[in-house]
């Protein structure tokens, strides 16, 4: 029997056993589809991700120090999904979601499903049930560190239960991965960082919940607060840096910076100005900003105010930036590469 007949026989047997479509050629025309994405609320981050946003049908991990903007970024993704008619759910394991802040970011609270589970097992069971339904587009788990195993809750405060949470996450992700892909649901895990003891070389930082999430996640975002935004003497927001640490859909290691304004979320207008200057769409002469010979204002804050009052110009700049997305992505990758080289030389 030649190879072709043997292969046909094997394929027929697989389809009889597991159903039609259980195995196919990757290049079959009807099977090749573009990956659906959901915007992050940050234009520069959408470009850095290479596919225009966070991918549906995949696992995403957002991690960083406290008060760095992890939940804010996840809520922006929920708001963007809801704008397109998506169904979203929020597993609030930390019991710390602020509905007033979520509404300010554009989240439709009336159509957001929320659960505040008592144990890690309960949280992950609810997650699996929602994913298997096939009706949810975005599901956020906040956070992995708060997924406390039932045995730990029932035990004494001083009980040593090493690896319990890691085993819980590993088992849950094994069960969830196939369901997430089939249902085309994006699951965002928010995670915290911890310090490893006795690390002499390299970064001592690690994320909670073991290594399973690092492997199963298609996208991992490291978000950090790198500075403060002041209005006279009052701090009104954070300068935030996000690095795409892992990306299975496009080149990783791109790095972007944007502003998060307290009570407002990600400053879209600030991004339009910064990215516009970077690719030459917005001209900067001294402290003045202009677009198509139209002066936007003196200083970044005045230029932002002008765009706030003239939404049509802001839309024009955004359209032009999206058309130049490839050029911006290359520049982001080069900048991140040079920074990595400098840090390696310093070590």
Curated annotation (Swiss-Prot):
List, alphabetically, the GO terms of the cellular component aspect. cytosol
Give the species this sequence originates from.
Bartonella quintana (strain Toulouse)
- Give the superkingdom in one word: Bacteria
Q: Where in the cell is it found?
A: Cytoplasm
GO molecular function annotations of the record: ATP binding; ATP hydrolysis activity; ATP-dependent DNA damage sensor activity; damaged DNA binding; single-stranded DNA binding
Per its record, how is this protein called by name?
Protein RecA
Gene symbol here is: recA
Query: Any idea which UniProt keywords this protein has?
Result: ATP-binding, Cytoplasm, DNA damage, DNA recombination, DNA repair, DNA-binding, Nucleotide-binding, SOS response
Which is a GO BP term held by this UniProt record?
DNA recombination
Enumerate the PANTHER family for this protein.
MITOCHONDRIAL DNA REPAIR PROTEIN RECA HOMOLOG-RELATED (PTHR45900:SF1), RECA (PTHR45900)
- One Pfam family, please name it: RecA_C
Q: Which PROSITE patterns match?
A: RECA_1, RECA_2, RECA_3
